[in-house]
């Protein structure tokens, strides 16, 4: 019933509003998000903010992903991340650094992600596996902060639905939306923004702009 109600929100045109679902008995207070657009240059210098997407194409080394399958078909999908020292140096009094996902806590009271003792932060990490007939078929994943689920879904659909082999699905140009508030501080949103790799054909880009 809930899914049927939510499906009515889907149309040919993207809404520029943030419209989270409301499940009876699980209503939560939503924080106020900045929808003036993403831009974390000054925050990146401090080691916070979205860690992966740069218009300059520069990388500084953070999240990685690895998949391993042995001869018996056992699979491991892992996305190590969360401890890059530029986001939190070692705290002398404690002897360890804070996980970079601590950015996803809120200091405002009464929110689902309000900082509290014993609470775990949410995470963008999504190492994944696909099953076929109940058996492991594919281990996959990617770095990418908030883009991980988006890029992985595109990759999987290109392979399973589009008929691409794994290398073709990886190499094909990708895209993602910045419509929703980012997980990393300062948690800005860019309503209606779609980011495409420059390798897309100009005709496709023009059609999307229209």
Task: Show where each model-derived region lies.
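Alpha-helical support elements that line or immediately flank enzyme active sites
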Residues: 142-168
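Mature, solvent-exposed C-terminal subdomains and processed small-chain segments of exported/organellar
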Residues: 1, 74, 163-167, 171-210
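Short, solvent-exposed loop/turn segments at the edges of secondary structure
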Residues: 61, 91-93, 120-126, 147, ...
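M16 family metallopeptidases and their MPP-like homologs
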Residues: 125-128, 134-149, 172, 188
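Hydrophobic alpha-helical scaffolding
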Residues: 55, 59-62, 115, 119, ...
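Active-site rim segments in enzyme catalytic domains, especially the processed small/beta chain
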Residues: 45-46, 50, 69-138, 162, ...
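Internal maturation/activation junctions in enzymes
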Residues: 1-81, 91-94, 184, 206
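Acidic, glycine-rich active-site loops and adjacent beta-strand->loop/helix elements
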Residues: 82-83, 101-104, 144-146, 174-176, ...
């Amino acid at each position: 019933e809930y899914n049927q109600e939510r499906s009515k929100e889907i149309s040919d045109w993207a809404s520029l509003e943030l419209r989270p679902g409301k499940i009876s008995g699980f209503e939560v207070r939503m924080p106020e998000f900045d929808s003036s657009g993403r831009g974390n240059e000054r925050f990146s210098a401090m080691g916070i903010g979205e860690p992966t997407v740069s218009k300059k194409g520069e990388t500084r080394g953070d999240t990685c992903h690895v998949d391993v399958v042995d001869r018996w078909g056992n699979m491991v999908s892992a996305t190590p991340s969360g401890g890059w020292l530029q986001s939190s140096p070692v705290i002398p009094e404690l002897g360890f650094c804070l996980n970079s996902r601590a950015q996803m806590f809120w200091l405002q009271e009464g929110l689902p992600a309000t900082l509290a003792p014993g609470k775990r932060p949410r995470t963008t990490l999504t190492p994944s596996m696909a099953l076929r007939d109940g058996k492991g078929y594919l281990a996959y994943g990617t770095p990418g902060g908030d883009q991980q689920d988006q890029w992985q879904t595109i990759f999987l659909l290109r392979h399973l639905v589009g008929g691409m082999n794994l290398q073709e699905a990886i190499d094909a140009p990708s895209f993602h939306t910045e419509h929703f508030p980012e997980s990393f501080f300062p948690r800005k949103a860019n309503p209606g923004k779609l980011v495409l790799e420059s390798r897309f054909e100009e005709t496709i880009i023009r059609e999307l702009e229209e």
